[in-house]
Regions:
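A conserved structural/catalytic subdomain of Rossmann-like adenosyl-cofactor enzymes
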Residues: 95, 99-455
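Alpha-helix termini
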Residues: 39-41, 87, 253, 302, ...
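A short hydrophobic/aromatic micro-motif that marks alpha-helical segments and, especially, helix-coil
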Residues: 41-43, 449, 461
Length: 462
């Protein structure tokens, strides 16, 4: 991870002081590795640099270890920059910006307590988690309280420098839910939308499973920069490194493999070259966006004027009598397959019509449509990629209208979503065995079992 934030800009490193931050620093391991790697690269390029480490940790034991470790190293001043408490609800670095950031935040962990401290999930106004796009669109990026991992990525993004040549670079580990959890318009999807439409995402790297001690699930490294090199602007690179692993001789908890130096170098080579291959794909940002639209179809009702209306439909008996009289007074020949015409003919008020309609009508696909009133049973949701030629209008014309010519899109319900799917781009179907191989195995099995049945039956007869 340190290489991902330092190596791409190693030739731009100057004689200067840099800052590195980890908002979920644990015992400070990542910060220490980052410091060592930056100093190493600076030495290779003949630069004199110093680095200030900043971190925050919520667990008291690991915070104490981190603090003590920083006190013992160097002049001990780094320890002053390690904060205690929750990064989400008690940001110890609210006014600071950093050159480099890296984290391995908790994933799949509730942040309900933090949400309550921040005023409740629906009322969080923290600018780290609420953003405005260039077109003025406000995005609430508050995820479900059961998993707050994306908030750590947003926290880092909010601390990026904008007034320096290098800007800021971020590398952060997440599980798969950060890529696709949440429907269009949800907090998770809005977070991805903000990061992608702001052109902050350089790459996402899929790591092998069982890479960490405490979990066997697949993990992904998000690489962010707000000063992308020209070739990366408007694009995201996906790297499938799931097969790049070296097995451990002995498992360490869930961890049963590692990335050797050679494998890490290979991942960096793929990242730096940014070329298409079986394990590397480069896409325009729009590839990951989509519209979620609500497709409506009109309600169609057939009227059955002779049906009984329950006595308790109205508070007073005379009200029911007036309604029944109004229905009987509808002129003969008034179409019963058109609710709009029939209801107007009764001359009843809207409130009365609303009460009686469930009892004297039934849905009928052959009846006339009621203008502006959708049939909720026929409501459908469609997902349309941004890359669909012609957009929503073309999709409706090509995919919906041929089968439902009366359909329309409820524009007020249209949402924009973003997701990144490695399965979509790197799926490898299981290779089926050839017929020759199967026949060969069957013949081999037949020869191996030849005479077995005779032996078994012979034993039974005796």
């Amino acid at each position: 991870m340190a290489d991902l934030i330092f190596v791409p800009i190693k030739d731009q490193i100057k004689d200067a002081t840099y800052s590195c931050y980890d908002g979920a620093c644990g015992t400070g391991g990542m910060l220490t590795v980052a410091q060592d790697r930056l100093l190493e690269l600076a030495e290779e390029t003949g630069k004199q640099v110093s680095i200030h480490l900043f971190g925050q940790e919520v667990q008291p034991e690991t915070y104490a270890i981190c603090k003590a470790d920083m006190l013992l190293k160097g002049d001990g001043k780094q320890a002053e920059h390690i904060s205690y408490g929750s990064t989400l609800s008690m940001d110890g670095n609210a006014t600071r910006q950093f050159d480099f950031m890296l984290s391995n935040p908790p994933y799949g962990k509730t942040w309900k307590v933090d949400a309550e401290k921040m005023g409740g999930k629906k009322d969080i106004l923290d600018s780290r988690f609420n953003a405005y796009l260039e077109d003025g669109t406000q995005l609430a990026m508050i995820p479900r309280v059961s998993d707050g991992q994306l908030l750590f990525l947003l926290n880092n993004a909010a601390k990026m420098k904008t007034d320096t040549p290098l800007g800021s670079r971020i590398a952060e580990v997440h599980n798969g839910s950060s890529l696709f959890t949440g429907d269009a318009g949800s907090g998770e999807s809005n977070a991805r939308r903000y990061l992608i439409e702001s052109d902050l995402v350089e790459a996402v790297i899929a790591l092998p499973e069982k890479m960490f001690y405490n979990t066997g699930i697949g993990t992904y490294i998000w690489v962010l920069s707000n000063k992308k090199e020209e070739r990366r602007k408007g694009k995201i690179q996906l790297i499938d490194a799931t097969a790049m692993k070296s097995p451990l001789r002995k498992n360490m908890g869930e961890k049963n493999c590692e990335l050797t130096l050679e494998l890490r170098d290979e991942i960096m080579r793929i990242f730096m070259e940014m070329e298409e291959s079986s394990v590397s794909r480069v896409f325009d940002n729009r590839e990951f966006g989509y519209w979620s639209i609500t497709v409506e179809r009109p309600l169609r009702l057939r009227v059955y004027p002779d049906r009984m209306i329950p006595a308790d439909t109205f508070k007073k008996a005379e009200e029911l009598e007036q309604v029944q009289k109004a229905i009987r007074s509808v002129p003969a020949g008034t179409p019963t397959d058109d609710w709009t015409v029939f209801s107007n003919a009764t001359k009843l008020k809207a409130a009365a019509l609303k009460k009686i309609r469930p009892f004297i009508t039934e849905k009928d696909p052959m009846a006339q449509p009621i203008e502006g009133e959708p049939d909720t049973d026929l409501r459908d949701t469609e997902i349309i990629p941004f890359t669909y030629e012609g957009g929503i209008d073309a999709f409706m014309k090509n995919e919906v209208m041929p089968y439902a010519p009366d359909a329309w899109v409820d524009q007020k319900k249209t949402q924009i979503g973003y997701e990144l799917s490695f399965t979509k781009y790197f799926y490898q179907p299981v290779q089926l065995r050839s017929m020759e191989e199967i026949v060969s195995d069957l013949k081999k099995l037949e020869s191996e079992t030849d005479g077995m049945l005779a032996e078994i039956l012979g034993g039974v007869e005796q």
